[in-house]
Regions:
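ACP-dependent fatty acid/polyketide chain-elongation machinery
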Residues: 1-73, 251-256
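Structured loops at beta-to-helix junctions and adjacent beta-edge loops in soluble globular domains
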Residues: 14, 113-115, 248
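Short, conserved beta-strand segments within well-ordered enzyme catalytic domains
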Residues: 10, 109-113
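A glycine- and small-residue-enriched flexible loop/hinge segment at structural boundaries
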Residues: 44-97, 112, 147-159
């Protein structure tokens, strides 16, 4: 690989699964219209909850997650499904999906951020184990942050190095910077980067409510998010960066 530290890196593909829209086009139209993405949460009972609204992507995974049972197969958590869908869209947007892009994906890196990981699965496992034997030598894999990237890399057919940065709210920026550094250092020619969360779970909501970070505003759900209102009660995308030389050679279009 022939790299220069000052070589310009470009974004050639984007993918989005978020409350404002599933898919890049739907997301962008929602942003332009200024549509509120806050809705009443229905994932679990509101009894005892401080707030009843949340920003939840209108996204139904192929395999539904059951709150009463542990998923039968690893990777059925909503977080994985959201991440895989966003990555697939970014690869398609960059012209690297399917058999045509298999060669480029063979050494493609994956650098992502998730602050809490597959929390829904973690909570389900803990509830199940509390009713029986807590010992399970293989359970650590589900709680391992590295497993998130490992599973996604396998499912999306990405053969390069991967890493998970659990750095919190700014994790998407960290992942982007990590991918940029990896390309400039010569570790990879191209990489998928992004941030993924599926935090609407009983434990996560309770934790945020405990520090008064959830809205208790008495209003319809769409009005619960008001960050610039003086009376406010409280206070995620995937992209595919690429070396410019590779982008020019492949005639890809830069992000607009």
């Amino acid at each position: 690989m022939n790299h220069r530290i000052d070589e310009r890196i470009v974004v050639t593909g984007l993918g989005v699964v978020c409350p404002a829209g599933v898919g890049l086009e739907a997301f962008w139209l929602s942003i332009l219209r200024g549509t509120s993405s806050i809705r009443e949460k229905t994932f679990f009972p509101n009894a005892g909850s401080r707030g009843r609204a949340a920003g939840i992507a209108q996204f139904e995974p192929a395999t539904q997650f059951s709150w009463s049972d542990i998923p039968k197969a690893e990777g059925q958590d909503r977080l994985f499904r959201i991440a895989q869908t966003a990555i697939d869209e970014a690869l398609a947007h960059a012209g690297l999906a399917g058999a045509a892009g298999a060669g480029d994906r063979a050494d493609m890196g994956l650098y992502i951020s998730s602050a809490i990981g597959p929390m829904a699965t973690m909570e389900a496992i803990v509830r199940e184990r509390l009713r029986g034997d807590l010992r399970d030598p293989g359970i650590w894999r589900t709680f391992s942050f590295g497993r998130i990237a490992s599973l996604l890399a396998s499912r999306c057919d990405l053969g390069g190095p991967y890493a998970v940065l659990p750095t919190g709210c700014a994790g998407g920026c960290d992942a982007l910077g990590y991918g940029l550094s990896a390309i400039r250092s010569g570790a990879v020619d191209r990489a998928v980067v992004g941030a993924f969360e599926a935090p609407v779970t009983p434990l996560v909501e309770a934790a945020f409510a405990r520090i008064n970070a959830t809205s208790s505003r008495d209003c319809p759900p769409k009005g619960a998010s008001c960050p610039f209102d003086t009376k406010r009660p409280a206070s995620g995308c995937t992209s595919l960066p690429d070396r410019r030389s590779v982008w020019l050679w492949r005639w890809c279009r830069p992000a607009r």
